[in-house]
Curated annotation (Swiss-Prot):
It comes from the Bacteria. Keywords: Magnesium, Metal-binding, Thiamine biosynthesis, Transferase. The gene is thiE. It holds the Pfam family TMP-TENI. This is Thiamine-phosphate synthase. Its EC number is 2.5.1.3. The keyword Flavoprotein does not apply. 2-[(2R,5Z)-2-carboxy-4-methylthiazol-5(2H)-ylidene]ethyl phosphate binds at residues 135-137, 165, 185-186. GO terms for molecular function: magnesium ion binding; thiamine-phosphate diphosphorylase activity. It is an enzyme of class 2 (transferase). It comes from Lacticaseibacillus casei (strain BL23). 4-amino-2-methyl-5-(diphosphooxymethyl)pyrimidine binds at residues 38-42, 70, 109, 138. GO terms for biological process: thiamine biosynthetic process; thiamine diphosphate biosynthetic process. Mg(2+) binds at residues 71, 90. One of its GO terms (cellular component) is cytoplasm.
Length: 213
């Protein structure tokens, strides 16, 4: 995969938005500089998830941004998304790779060096490490120390993104950590002005990511 796709990775969250507002937020983020979108829907039926994924993919395709589906291999394949992202309570990494084939992107959430190395060996294309900071979207998620993040980036040959409570104000924390990008939820999805927020994040990232110039 292209590691530059991971610079500013939007992970969606519906909050109380209706579908039109939700889609408009994704479109605004895509138009203004996010580089990848993950559709994460835990509560929808399979049919509703499929139909929403189709609508989101129309947006990401318009801006030529990869769409990743959280957890659901079936939805990923049904809408021909760029790939799927799985956590440690989903299908095993090797099985997921077998199901999606060699060409789709496979992202895996990890919290330790050991699980990171194992995920890469089993076929992960990139890793999401965190939660780095406390996060409202996963209130009980344990915090992963920056030292662990650095150790993971040093040990694996695939790109790593930091996730969990990432905000414009704490991006400086990630200097010299070796990450390829950051995954952000509420800082974008709940921003009063998404266009301005995404542009500000991209500007701030130029001082953080060594290859974002």
């Amino acid at each position: 995969m292209n590691a530059t796709d991971l610079k500013l990775y939007l992970v969606t969250h519906r909050y109380d938005d209706n579908e039109a507002t939700f889609l408009a937020k994704i479109a605004a983020a895509c138009e203004n500089g996010v580089t990848m979108v993950q559709l994460r829907e835990k509560m929808l039926s399979t049919r509703a998830y499929f139909e929403l994924a189709q609508r989101v993919k129309l947006i990401t395709d318009r801006y030529q941004i990869p769409l990743i589906i959280d957890d659901r291999v079936d939805i990923c394949l049904a809408v021909d998304a760029a790939g799927v992202h799985i956590g440690d309570d989903e299908l095993p990494v090797a099985m997921t790779r077998q199901l999606i084939g060699p060409d789709k992107v496979l992202g895996v959430s990890t919290k330790t060096v050991e699980t990171a190395v194992a995920a890469v060996a089993a076929g992960a294309d990139y890793l999401g490490v965190g939660a780095i900071f406390p996060t409202q979207t996963k209130a009980n998620a344990p915090v992963t120390p920056i030292a662990t993040l650095k150790a993971i980036t040093a040990q694996v040959a695939v790109p790593v993104v930091a996730i969990g409570g990432v905000k414009e104000a704490n991006l400086g924390t990630f200097k010299e950590t070796g990450i390829a990008g950051v995954a952000i939820v509420s800082e974008i999805m709940q921003a009063p002005d998404i266009a301005h927020k995404v542009q500000a994040l991209r500007t701030k990232l130029k001082a953080v990511l060594p290859n974002d110039r």
